[in-house]
Design a protein with these regions (language model features):
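Basic, ligand-binding patches in group-transfer machinery
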Residues: 1-121
Length: 121
């Protein structure tokens, strides 16, 4: 679990940051400690952006850390397929002022067996 004065969160999956060939899931939860509303989460692998699902019910986490289960729900997940040679994963959050801020970063390894090139954006 990661925590600061404003929020706490955890990335529960995957348990290893060496990715298999193909698609994989990244999942966890995020809770504001101040009552601030956050609008979205996104994930970056190097310069590629992945949209995910933010706001999945996690009553176990919501009850434990917030004292009630319900909106805003804490869970999130992303399905990603890291490109060959991918090195860095970053989780970013969108605040109510429409500003993206880095929440967390993790070095990663993508196997050499992935033949697709990183798409040009």
């Amino acid at each position: 679990m990661n925590e600061n004065d404003a929020y706490l969160f955890d990335v529960e999956l995957p348990t290893s940051w060496t990715f298999p060939v193909g698609k994989t899931w990244i999942a966890g939860w995020f809770i504001s400690k101040t009552g601030a509303q956050f609008r979205d989460l996104r994930l970056r692998i190097d310069d590629r952006i992945f949209a995910g699902i933010f706001g999945q019910p996690r009553p176990d986490i919501e009850l434990r850390y917030r004292g009630y289960a319900g909106l805003p729900h804490a869970g999130f997940c992303f399905q990603v397929e890291p490109h060959r040679g991918a090195k860095l994963l970053r989780l970013e959050i969108l605040d109510h002022g429409n500003n993206w801020a880095e929440l967390w970063r993790q070095p990663i390894k993508a196997p050499r067996g992935i033949r697709r090139r990183q798409p040009v954006l």
